[in-house]
A protein has these predicted regions:
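Residue-level signal for pocket-adjacent positions within structured domains
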Residues: 29, 33, 97, 144
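RNase H-like DDE/DDD metal-dependent nuclease/strand-transfer catalytic core used by mobile genetic elements
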Residues: 46-92
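Short beta->alpha junction loops/turns
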Residues: 40-43, 71-72, 98, 121
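Extended, low-complexity cationic-aromatic segments
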Residues: 1-53, 149-151
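Short, glycine/charged-enriched secondary-structure capping and boundary segments
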Residues: 1-3, 79-83, 107-108
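C-terminal anion-handling pockets and recognition modules
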Residues: 105-153
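RNase H-like polynucleotidyl transferase catalytic core
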Residues: 5-16, 84-104, 121
Length: 153
């Protein structure tokens, strides 16, 4: 197909920005249910807020084991009292350094990029957040897609 030279490589103008959003997430390996939480930034306080949300989603008499990378805020001193209070319901296991391929949630982030953000221009950060949140609402219930994607053999 012939395309005029001036239309061959269209230039998409976009305003430079340093805006960002933090997204915490966890997948139940038992049933594939996804729990996510948007924040303005990653730090110990926002991580503690996410852990509180995660504890609300846990099944009775079940302990939650979370696989984590070694981000600084995962080891924060201010988390110790919270973790001590919830040690019967919450356990944290740290993955080896520089090994994101071992973290099941990384597969979910890759699928999210593929399905709703890949090769897409979002004029506003809010539009991006809405697109990701809409996709994640589908996965807020037990589902086979995420269960199979995140299964550990």
């Amino acid at each position: 197909m012939w395309v005029p030279p001036e239309d061959k490589d269209p230039i998409l103008l976009m305003a430079p920005t340093r805006k960002s959003v933090a997204l915490f997430g966890a997948v139940s390996l038992r049933d594939g249910k996804l729990v996510t939480h948007f924040e303005k930034k990653f730090n110990a306080m926002t991580f503690r807020d996410f852990l509180t949300i995660l504890l609300r989603h846990r099944r009775r008499m079940r302990k939650i084991v979370i696989l984590l990378d070694n981000a600084k805020y995962h080891h924060a001193v201010m988390l110790r009292p919270f973790l001590k209070n919830h040690r019967d319901r919450l356990a944290m296991e740290f993955l080896p350094a520089y090994s994101p391929e071992l973290n099941p949630i990384e597969r979910v982030w890759k699928l999210t990029r593929k399905l709703c953000t890949h090769n897409t221009y979002f004029e506003k950060l809010e539009t991006l957040i809405d697109a990701v949140a809409t996709e994640h609402k589908i996965w807020n219930v037990p589902n086979e897609t995420l269960r199979k994607l995140c299964c550990i053999i």
